[in-house]
Regions:
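Membrane-embedded transmembrane alpha-helical bundles that form the catalytic cores
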Residues: 1-486
Length: 487
């Protein structure tokens, strides 16, 4: 079930919030939130709820056995979680490398269908799975690995309540596509939090803005991408660049907003990556929770930059190969990760020279290389990558004669909206607007109250307008699945 579906927006979420805020006490609220999270997951893939609960209990038990400083106690949970991720996500990929032909849908999907049929034969009524990859498994695996690693490091204590750990791992706002929230960030909030009217309003505001990013920008950009032929390779790459940003950052906004409504503060995941002036800066702003995971749990433990340049390069190679593979079991993702490894390695050598260039030049050069990276990302086959680059760099039909000029003209309003939406302008406008109304100072207390009232009313009306536009769009056609749901 997608956050951007009418079923979620007007049935599941309102009912969940109604029950959550009606029940007294944090313990009952946590029970409601856990039940809603498991139901949310079951609506997508019912049989995988058993895997979610079972794997969570295994990690609960293994974490209790971890002893700080004793690596063997950490090795088991890390291996178990990586093995589960590998079986579901990478088994068919590696079998293919060794020339082993797999059945249609893959080995794990066939096995899961057999298990489902067996359970149904003894009275269960599970729907046969259509995908071998449980929803959100990559995000789940990294969250639980960060948890057991932090227990080993002594940063957090092993959770004594399986209920609390399961709630942390399965909370539906962040379960499917992150952010990758660490246990230490929410451990205290599991047992001590409250939702104020202000927090609920801020959460709703963040959610609706994220919904608008997904429905009004990402989905329409995706339609342009799908409609273009190879003659429009440059326009397709540019629209995909905006599609994936608004799709994923929109989901992150919705997740963070929902968490805020329930009293949680999740980590940020995006910070205007398309205003970056270097590849290094881009990755500090893009999917920040994934970048910090690889930094803290892979790059630094491998030695980081403390053991000489040669070792640093090898550590970067490991990080970016894993980053590519995390996104998918396909060669294009491996190439995508290695591509950024090469760019970052070169950039480290020439960074002082680049800093002398004007901001706009550095930004345009950075975005050009990011755009090339998205071409690798969006084409799942090597032949597709080759065709795209051939069309972009001289091997395709001419721009004027391919009909793309008309598509560019038709897409120009959306393109400009995406360009503005991914810039710093909306943030500046928000600061200006709040300064004019919400943060205005006055000698009279009543005047300040009136200004704040006008500000809140204007924001409320703007959010209602966005929600209405999203609803109209969703009634006309269903929203496309979130792009990172497959990861």
């Amino acid at each position: 079930m997608e956050f951007s579906s009418l079923y979620f927006l007007y049935l599941f979420l309102p009912l969940t919030l109604l029950v959550y805020f009606l029940v007294p006490g944090l313990r009952l609220k946590n029970i409601v939130l856990l039940a809603a999270s498991l139901l949310f997951y079951a609506m997508g893939q019912p049989v995988y709820v058993l895997l979610l609960v079972g794997l969570s209990y295994a990690n609960f038990a293994m974490a209790r056995c971890i002893r700080p400083g004793k690596r063997n106690t950490l090795l088991l949970p890390v291996v178990v979680n990586l093995a589960v991720l590998g079986l579901f996500k990478y088994l068919d990929f590696f079998l293919g490398i060794f020339g082993i032909t797999v059945a249609d849908g893959g080995v794990m999907l066939a096995a899961l269908r057999g298990i489902t049929n067996g359970l149904n034969s003894i009275g269960f009524a599970f729907r046969s799975p259509t995908s071998a990859l449980p929803l959100g498994l990559s995000f789940y695996a990294f969250q639980v690995i960060s948890y057991v690693a932090d227990v080993y490091r002594g940063k957090v204590k092993a959770e004594r309540s399986f209920f609390n750990l399961l709630l942390y791992l399965s909370m539906f706002p962040k379960m499917m596509q992150g952010p990758i929230v660490r246990y230490e960030q929410v451990a205290r909030q599991l047992m001590d939090r409250r939702t104020t009217p202000r927090a609920a309003f801020e959460g709703a505001q963040r959610f609706i803005i994220g919904l608008a990013k997904k429905v009004l920008l990402a989905d329409y950009a995706g339609k342009v991408v799908a409609s273009l032929s190879t003659g429009g390779a440059w326009l397709a790459a540019l629209m995909f660049m905006f599609q994936i940003y608004f799709d994923f950052s929109g989901y992150s906004d919705m997740a963070i907003g929902l968490g805020r409504i329930f009293g949680f503060r999740y980590c940020e995941n995006f910070d205007l990556p398309y205003i970056s002036t270097s590849i290094t800066e881009f990755w500090r702003r893009w999917h920040m929770s994934l970048g910090s995971f690889f930094r803290d749990y892979v790059y630094i433990p491998l030695g980081g930059n403390r053991r000489g340049k040669a070792r640093q390069i090898l550590n970067l190679l490991a990080v970016w190969a894993l980053t590519g593979l995390w996104h998918g079991a396909s060669w294009n993702f491996v190439l995508w990760g290695l591509y950024f490894f090469v760019l970052l390695s070169i950039e480290k050598q020439i960074a002082p020279k680049l800093e002398t260039l004007p901001f706009i030049v550095r930004n345009l050069v950075t975005m050009f290389f990011v755009l090339i990276g998205w071409v690798l990302f969006m084409n799942t086959s090597l032949s597709g990558i080759g065709s795209a680059f051939a069309a972009m760099f001289g091997g395709g039909t001419s721009f004027a004669g391919s009909g793309v000029s008309l598509q560019l003209k038709n897409s120009l309003p959306l393109l400009l909206t995406c360009l503005i939406g991914s810039s710093v302008l909306p943030r500046w406008f928000g600061f200006l607007w709040s300064g004019l109304f919400g943060m205005g100072r006055s000698d009279r207390r009543g005047a300040v109250t009136v200004k704040k009232g006008i500000y809140l009313a204007s924001v409320f009306l703007f959010l209602i307008l966005l929600l209405w536009l999203c609803t109209v769009s969703l009634v006309g056609s269903t929203s496309s699945p979130s792009m990172y749901a497959q990861f």
